[in-house]
Amino acid sequence: MIVGFNEEELLPACLQSIGFCNDIHYTDLGSTDGSVKIAEQFAQHIYHRAPVPSCEMIQTEVVHYTKNDWVIFIDPDEVVDETLATEIINRFDELTSQPQVGGIKVPWQFYFKRTRLRGTVWGGKNQKFFLVNKHRFAFDPVVHYGRKLKPAFTSTTIALNKGETNVLHHYWMNSWQVFIRKHRRYLINEGIDRYNIGTRTSFKEVLLAPYYEFKRSFWTLKGYKDGILGFFLSAFWAWYQTSAMLSLYKIQQQKALQAK
């Protein structure tokens, strides 16, 4: 499954990298470039939907249209390395044979403007659910928190090889403008989504968030390895998390007043 909007520069590499799949579903969110024509060259199914804040809201629907039990979900700015594709193909039966396994994680390498990130909350040795069983894995319409294993199921992980080549390349952001615009869009629903999944915060936590979130990204998760880029990304992360927590706190206050 893949969801896209005006991604003609990124789509070819992404779709070519999943050429080993036999049932590709592409959903377009109103692209005005050549995205749909590109998708027609690779995808067996194409859908058109109105724009939404995040792709989870589309995947919730489309996952039910897929013919296979095991499904790959990938973003237009992601590319499956040939080494990873070969490993998935060769180990597919082994990886999916256990009845309690609902999802398989793969090594996930972030890039900012084609620069490999070695630290921050995004970079370093990251992992992502990539191949999942649609009967054992949940796709809920919740920004950042909608994709998770169903109760009683576990995951398995494809380990990073010595050459660090068997990765899902994530060409995450190609400009600061796109980076800021996307995260502003995510913030629209971040507070209410956190509230709906049971997350709660306090005024004290909101006040301390800038310090703790910057420290976590820049020092704990080694954002300093990325130099000035790591500093600015960590500062942005601190702002984003603080904004999301403040939104959540305001919603909590509103709900408390309504309950009186």
PLM ranges: what are they?
Residues 17, 28-38, 51-52, 75:
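A conserved acidic beta->alpha catalytic loop
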Residues 36-65, 94:
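Conserved donor nucleotide-binding strand/loop of the catalytic core
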Residues 21-22, 43, 68:
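Short, well-ordered alpha-helix to beta-strand connector turns
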Residues 69, 75-79:
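The conserved acidic donor/metal-binding loop of glycosyltransferases
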Residues 56-63, 70, 82-254:
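Catalytic-site signature of metal-activated, phosphate-bearing donor transferases
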Residues 1-2, 25:
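Short hydrophobic beta-strand elements that form part
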Residues 2-20:
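Short, well-formed alpha-helical segments that are part of the catalytic scaffolds
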